[in-house]
Amino acid sequence: MFESVQGLLDEHAAIQAQLGDPAVYADQKLARKLGRRSAQLNGIVEAYHRWESIRDDLAAAKEMADEDPEFAAEVPELEASLETAAAKLRRLLIPRDPDDARNVILEVKGGEGGDEAALFAADLLRMYSRYAESRGWKTELISATESDLGGYKDVQMAVKGNSNDPAEGVYARLKFEGGVHRVQRVPVTESQGRIHTSAAGVLVLPEVDEPEELEINQNDLKIDVYRSSGPGGQSVNTTDSAVRITHLPTGIVVAMQNEKSQLQNREAGMRVLRARILAHQQEQIDAENSAQRKSQIRTMDRSERIRTYNYPENRIADHRTGYKAYNLDQVMNGDLEPVIQSAIEMDEQARLDAIGE
């Protein structure tokens, strides 16, 4: 059992030797790559040694069981521990998403429902901000287009984590949030107290660590400049500081107007553009990988309705995993972990099933 782990143990040992060589850090790109891979393997190595230790203890207990009742009494407990350790190791051996350890750019757009949808988009952004805070992550507002009532027509926020462990990476935790989030509640603009349904779309993009990691040919870019505008479309700048960047090969378009200068908006736009191109490339890889296609959760498609937030019933329901709870007030305040974990566990099971086929 777990014969394939030996190759990973050897790789881990080789990486530790490299990281112990000060000369490696002269190449920061290589050092980061080795650090990420080391973090990916650390959990597997620890889990394997734990399983191996219990296996050996069980073998010794069985050998001594006939002569010593105390050893015989340990056998059932060790067998249960061995199965638990084996299950953990099997899950760790599931091929991980290569982007799991990355930071993300989170985009939220108000959808059906006009002003109410924009207000809900703002509520979602606040929810994710508080969840990030609870995990010790840092957030940075990149761009926002406000509605007349103070919501967001669209907004982009960077989320930066504090761990190299892929399982604890920002993208690993947030990637299943992509899709349509539907809300049912009485809008602030509703005078009759009627419940309305509106929606907001969420897109989670893995962020490129360094600009040189993803080369973009400047000849592939079309850059337009214009005057920035505020709620209602009124002009808020007398200079052409807003920037629209089109990546011609993919057709991806990024518009940025929040910063005061054209240069700052261009830099922010390129940051988002790199993330979108990286996501586009990963989608193409996923389409060619049958194991990835069998994952029941992961999606970049914001047209898929993934969750409903019902305020009158204080209920949240995830339509992919079947998760349901009546603590919506807590969820909107950032208590997202149980909801997110349900998606992660369903995805892990789907990947395990795919490996077994």
UniProtKB/Swiss-Prot annotation:
Q: Which UniProt keywords apply?
A: Cytoplasm, Methylation, Protein biosynthesis
What disulfide bonds does the UniProt entry report for this chain?
A: none
User: One short Pfam family name for this protein?
Assistant: PCRF
InterPro entries to which the protein is assigned, alphabetical: PCRF, Pep_chain_release_fac_I, Pep_chain_release_fac_I_sf, Prokaryotic/Mito_RF, RF-1
GO MF entries:
translation release factor activity, codon specific
Which terms in the GO cellular component ontology are assigned? cytoplasm
Asked whether the UniProt record includes Cytoplasm among its keywords, one would answer yes
Residues where N5-methylglutamine occurs?
Answer: Q234
Q: Where in the cell is it found?
A: Cytoplasm
Keyword Mitochondrion listed? The answer is no
Matching entries from SUPFAM superfamilies are given as: Release factor (SSF75620)
What does the UniProt PTM comment say about this protein? Methylated by PrmC. Methylation increases the termination efficiency of RF1.
Q: What does this protein do?
A: Peptide chain release factor 1 directs the termination of translation in response to the peptide chain termination codons UAG and UAA.
What family does this chain come from, according to its entry?
Belongs to the prokaryotic/mitochondrial release factor family.
What name has this protein been given in UniProt? Answer: Peptide chain release factor 1
Give the originating organism.
Arthrobacter sp. (strain FB24)
